[in-house]
Amino acid sequence: MQSKILIIEDDHAITHLLDVALTLDYYNVTTADNATQAHFKIQIDKPDVILLDLGLPDKDGLCLISEIRQHTDIPIIVISARQEEQTIIQALDNGANDYMTKPFNVDELRARIRVIERIAKSHQETNIVFTNGLLSIDFGSKSVVINNQEVHLTPNEFSLLELLSNHKGKVLTYEMILKRIYGYVNKTEMPSLRVHMTSLRQKLSQCHEDAKDIIKTHPRIGYQMLQWKEK
């Protein structure tokens, strides 16, 4: 099956160049020239890889990365003329998987796409299922089920649940969680972590009231996944 690539770029010359080059490599290519179209194409076409320019006419690409990451973990390669170190760091922190600056080499881009595809394939093949009482987590498909009901989580919520389940019974400090989820330790992210945890607990408990008790808060220390106990 052909991999699907979505190009989000308002420069039609670059879009055409990428479309031709990637189609010759047997990719199924779709395009969007603004953020509004991009959201629609992501929802309808469900691409395997996104190529994103930051200078879109209706929204800054950095904001778009964050919005995309609220509902999907599709790999994103940024291709931008912006070369500032802080911009590159922010794009990666917001959820981009890779960053290339313009002008760029098409063959190098092809190679980076292949790397991302190999990583995605290896994750799919690691089809490990974790169970804890009525909770079931499929790490390969990133699906969560409680009491035969699917739980729809954001990428950050899933990462948080995955981390806790991989260390079931162990108290994970806030610092460790921040490092694993965000890639760095910054105490300013604590409110964001608490919001993700609150939302995660609410979604789990909507499927079964006992689910809220499997994650324990240790004040000023961190969180711990406990064994499921039905009341």
Curated annotation (Swiss-Prot):
List the CDD domains: trans_reg_C (cd00383)
Q: Which UniProt keywords apply?
A: DNA-binding, Phosphoprotein, Transcription, Transcription regulation, Two-component regulatory system
Location of the DNA-binding region in this protein: 127-227
Phenotype when inactivated?
Inactivation of kdpE results in decreased transcript level of cap.
GO cellular component labels: cytosol; protein-DNA complex
Q: Note the PROSITE patterns from the entry.
A: OMPR_PHOB, RESPONSE_REGULATORY
* Location of 4-aspartylphosphate modifications: 53
Mod. after translation = Phosphorylated by KdpD. Phosphorylation is required for transcriptional activity.
Specify the Response regulatory domain's residue ranges. Answer: 4-117
Spans through the membrane: none
A Gene Ontology biological process noted in the UniProt record is: regulation of DNA-templated transcription
Q: Which GO terms describe its molecular function?
A: phosphorelay response regulator activity; transcription cis-regulatory region binding
What does its record list under induction?
Answer: By the Agr/RNAIII system.
- One Pfam family matching this protein: Trans_reg_C
Role played: Member of the two-component regulatory system KdpD/KdpE that regulates the transcription of a series of virulence factors through sensing external K(+) concentrations. Also regulates capsular polysaccharide synthesis. Upon phosphorylation by KpdD, functions as a transcriptional regulator by direct binding to promoter regions of target genes including spa, hla, aur and geh. Represses the transcription of kdpFABC operon.
Q: Quote the protein name from its UniProt record.
A: Transcriptional regulatory protein KdpE
Source species of the chain: Staphylococcus aureus (strain NCTC 8325 / PS 47)
Q: Name the gene that codes for it.
A: kdpE
